[in-house]
Regions:
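PRPP-associated nucleotide enzymes
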Residues: 1-367
Length: 367
C-alpha cells in the first residue's frame, strides 16, 4: 500500500482474526519510522467499544502458552500498550489462575525507586522508565510477560527483556504478546536472556520502502521535546508501581449528564486503564460508549487517521499531544479522564469537543 512517504508491503502468515478487523495504517511524522500501524481494538487512535477491547485482550491472553510458570510479571509498554497490557494480565490470570503481577513502563518521573531504564529505538520518545514494584519479591518471579500493541522488529521487547531480566534472578521464561507481530519468524527471540516465545492475533512480515521525496521530518527541536520526561508529584498508582491480578481499582462516582446516552471516554497519555474500566461500567449501564486516548505520536491525516486535534500535554511537559478521529459533530458527549491535577487538561481540547474533564484523584478514588 502507498502511504505517500513510501510503500508498505505485508505478508500474513497466520491470523486468528481478519487484518482489517484489527488494524489500519497511516503515515506519521517520524524520521525513525514513517508509517504507523493503527489498531482498531486498542482504544487509542480509533474509537472502539470497551467490550470489543476486552474481547481482543481475552483472545490474546488465550493465545499465550498455558504452562507459563508463576509468579508471572506482566509488563505493558507505555504509552500505547498500558491498557492492553493490564487487560491481558487480568484475563490471563482469570483464565489460568496462579499468582500474577502487572507493571508498566512510563515516561513520567515519580518519587519511587527506579528498577531500570531502556530505549525504544524507533519511537519519537525513546526513553522508558521502569519503577520497582511495591509488594513483590522480584526473586520469586519465574515468567516475564511483555505486552506491546505490535511488534515490528522485536528490538524494543528484546531491549526491555534484557533490562528487566537482570533484576529477576529466578526468571525461567519470557513470553511476548502483541495484537500484531510483523517480525517475520521471531529471530529476535534468540537474543532474549531466557527461553522466549511470542504470541499474537496476526503474524506476518512487513517491508517498508521509503519514497525518494517525502514530506519534511519534524525539526530536531521537536525530537528533543518529544523525548522529555514528565513528572508527577502526587501519584495515582494504576500500574507504575505494580498491581496484583484481581486488585480492586476505585473509580469516580460518575454519571453522564441527563439524556446523554452516546459517550466518548478519553484516556490521557499513559492513564488509560482506569478510564477503560469506567467506560466498561458505563457500557454495562446501557450507554453507547467508545474509548480513545490522547497520544504523543504525531500522525498525518490519511488512511486510518482522519480528524486530528493538537493541544498541550496535561503532564506539564512541552510535548505536543494529539487526539485522532474525534469530532464534536458526531454527537457524543466526551469525558476526558486524567490523573494530573484539576485544571491540567488543555482547555483547547475540552472546548474542541464540548467535553468535560474528569479527575481520578478526588474523593472516592484511591490515590
Amino acid at each position: 500500500m502507498d502511504l505517500g512517504a513510501g510503500t508498505l508491503s505485508l505478508e500474513i502468515e497466520r491470523a486468528l482474526r481478519p487484518l482489517d478487523s484489527l488494524c489500519g495504517f497511516a503515515r506519521r511524522r517520524n524520521p525513525r519510522r514513517a508509517f504507523l500501524i493503527v489498531s482498531r481494538v486498542l482504544g487509542r487512535h480509533i474509537p472502539v467499544r470497551p467490550s470489543e477491547m476486552r474481547v481482543a485482550a481475552r483472545d490474546l491472553a488465550a493465545a499465550l502458552p498455558s504452562d507459563l510458570p508463576g509468579p508471572v510479571l506482566t509488563v505493558g509498554l507505555a504509552e500505547t500498550a498500558v491498557c492492553l497490557g493490564q487487560t491481558v494480565h487480568e484475563e490471563r490470570a482469570r483464565l489460568r489462575g496462579g499468582e500474577s503481577h502487572f507493571l508498566h513502563s512510563t515516561r513520567q518521573e515519580i518519587d519511587a525507586p527506579l528498577l531500570c531504564r531502556f530505549e525504544e529505538p524507533h519511537s519519537h520518545a525513546s526513553a522508558h522508565l521502569i519503577y520497582r514494584p511495591e509488594g513483590l519479591d522480584l526473586a520469586r518471579v519465574r515468567t516475564l510477560l511483555l505486552v506491546d500493541d505490535e511488534i515490528s522488529t522485536g528490538t524494543t521487547l528484546a531491549n526491555l527483556g534484557a533490562a528487566i531480566a537482570r533484576h529477576l534472578p529466578g526468571l525461567e521464561r519470557i513470553a511476548a504478546a502483541s495484537l500484531t507481530d510483523w517480525s517475520g519468524g521471531g529471530a529476535w527471540l534468540d537474543s532474549m536472556p531466557r527461553p522466549a516465545s511470542a504470541s499474537s492475533l496476526i503474524e506476518g512480515r512487513l517491508e517498508w520502502r521509503p519514497a525518494k521525496a517525502t514530506e519534511a521530518a519534524p525539526a530536531t527541536g521537536f525530537a528533543a521535546v518529544a523525548g522529555r520526561l514528565g513528572r508527577i508529584e502526587r501519584h495515582w498508582n494504576s500500574g507504575r508501581l505494580g498491581s496484583q491480578a484481581g486488585a480492586p481499582i476505585a473509580l469516580p462516582a460518575y454519571s453522564p449528564p441527563a439524556g446523554q446516552r452516546r459517550l466518548r471516554v478519553v484516556g490521557t497519555g499513559e492513564f488509560t486503564y482506569p478510564p477503560f474500566l469506567l467506560a466498561e461500567r458505563l457500557e454495562r449501564e446501557g450507554h453507547d460508549v467508545v474509548v480513545q486516548a490522547t497520544s504523543r505520536s504525531p500522525v498525518l491525516p490519511g488512511g486510518a487517521v482522519g480528524a486530528a486535534l493538537r493541544f498541550s500535554d496535561n503532564y506539564g511537559t512541552d510535548v505536543p499531544n494529539f487526539l485522532y478521529n474525534a469530532e464534536a459533530a458526531d454527537g457524543r458527549h466526551t469525558i476526558v479522564c486524567h490523573e494530573t491535577p484539576p485544571g491540567s487538561v488543555d482547555p483547547a481540547l475540552v472546548e474542541a469537543l464540548g467535553a468535560e474533564a474528569l479527575f481520578f484523584g478526588g474523593p472516592g478514588c484511591a490515590p
